[in-house]
């Protein structure tokens, strides 16, 4: 009997260890209304970005009659929809990337150390929760926070590390990173 309890305790400890602590950022809150026979019913919609600041990020939206409940729902949805993004040196993107959603377009560029996060509004929240320290990003078209975050996530999903590229092509990482001889001769 005691052995079974010890096993259960170890399993509980392991599940607690595997659940990393997530940081969250509230991006937008909107007051929404529904017109009914007796008048208008007001509610709130929240947009939240959640990440572990080590390469995982997700976003969610929640709607409820009260603000805290909407934020809680959005946070839960964001935790369920997290994606993993390969980061170079744990601080920036591997390559320049473009993301689109609806009328929104986002261009993200890898940056040298010390650049910081040069991005506006909702994109900044995504990069901070992801753990990116150096990036230059520009949003074009739709300035709607939902579209901007979805376009940013679209671009991040396309991000791939040299290891992933090498695996797809059936080559070694050194072959992917190697410069062509023409460039080496000029340099």
Swiss-Prot record:
Single GO cellular component term: small ribosomal subunit
Q: Which parts of the sequence are annotated with region: Disordered?
A: 1-20, 154-174
One Gene Ontology term from the biological process aspect of the record: translation
Which parts form a coiled-coil structure per UniProt? Answer: none
Give every S5 DRBM domain span: 22-85
Q: Which GO terms describe its molecular function?
A: rRNA binding; structural constituent of ribosome
Q: Does the keyword RNA-binding apply?
A: yes
**TM region positions:** none
Q: Which UniProt keywords apply?
A: Ribonucleoprotein, Ribosomal protein, RNA-binding, rRNA-binding
What is one Pfam family matched by this protein?
Ribosomal_S5
What's the stated role of this polypeptide? With S4 and S12 plays an important role in translational accuracy. Located at the back of the 30S subunit body where it stabilizes the conformation of the head with respect to the body.
Please give the family membership noted in the entry: Belongs to the universal ribosomal protein uS5 family.
Quaternary assembly:
Part of the 30S ribosomal subunit. Contacts proteins S4 and S8.
Domain comment quoted from the record: The N-terminal domain interacts with the head of the 30S subunit; the C-terminal domain interacts with the body and contacts protein S4. The interaction surface between S4 and S5 is involved in control of translational fidelity.
HAMAP family xref list: Ribosomal_uS5_B
> Which PANTHER family does this UniProt record tie to the protein?
MITOCHONDRIAL RIBOSOMAL PROTEIN S5
- According to UniProt, the name of this protein is Small ribosomal subunit protein uS5
What is the protein's species of origin? Answer: Cereibacter sphaeroides (strain ATCC 17025 / ATH 2.4.3) (Rhodobacter sphaeroides)
Q: Which gene encodes it?
A: rpsE
């Amino acid at each position: 009997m005691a052995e079974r309890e010890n096993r259960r305790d170890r399993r509980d400890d392991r599940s607690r260890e595997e659940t990393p602590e997530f940081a969250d950022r509230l991006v937008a809150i909107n007051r929404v209304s529904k017109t009914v026979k007796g008048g208008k019913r007001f509610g709130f919609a929240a947009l939240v970005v959640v990440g572990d600041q080590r390469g995982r990020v997700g976003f969610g939206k929640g709607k409820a009659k009260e603000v805290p409940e909407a934020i809680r729902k959005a946070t839960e949805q964001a935790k369920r929809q997290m994606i993993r993004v390969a980061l170079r040196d744990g601080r920036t993107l591997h390559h320049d990337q473009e993301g689109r959603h609806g009328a929104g377009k986002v261009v993200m560029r890898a940056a040298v150390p010390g650049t910081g996060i040069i991005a506006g509004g909702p994109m900044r929240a995504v990069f901070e929760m992801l753990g990116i320290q150096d990036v230059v990003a520009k949003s074009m078209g739709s300035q709607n926070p939902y579209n901007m975050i979805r376009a940013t996530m679209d671009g991040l999903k396309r991000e791939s590390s040299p290891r992933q590229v090498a695996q797809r092509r059936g080559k070694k990482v050194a072959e992917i990173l190697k410069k062509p001889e023409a460039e080496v001769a000029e340099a």
